[in-house]
Amino acid sequence: MLVFLHAVFITVLILLLIGRLQLLERLLLNHSLNLKTVNNVLGVTHTGLKVNCLQLLKPDCLDFNILHRSLAETRLLKVVLRVIFLVLLGFCCYRLLVTLF
């Protein structure tokens, strides 16, 4: 019974982690969209003052590859956690059936 409770506890923790990773993924996508928007606006010629203000928003070391790589790593981690969740859920169901019968 103690093993079953530990498995349920770990399963709940994995579900919470998956929720946090989904939030992180949304934030990364939103940040990527904002950076692309700033980059597109900077490419258009405007008055000097407006471009200077927008250049303050754009860092010099802007690298979209790093952002996309972190987004891919977040998605991969989410898939791995879902697989672990399904294995633990199967184990919990198995232990419950063994206990009942």
Swiss-Prot record:
The keyword GTP-binding does not apply. Belongs to the coronaviruses ns7/ns7a protein family. Residues 1-23 form the signal peptide. It is found in: Host membrane. This is Non-structural protein 7a. It is a single-pass membrane protein. Keywords: Host membrane, Membrane, Signal, Transmembrane, Transmembrane helix. It comes from the Viruses. Its main location: host cell. The chain crosses the membrane at residues 81-101. GO terms for cellular component: host cell membrane; membrane. The keyword Cell wall biogenesis/degradation does not apply. InterPro entries: Corona_7.
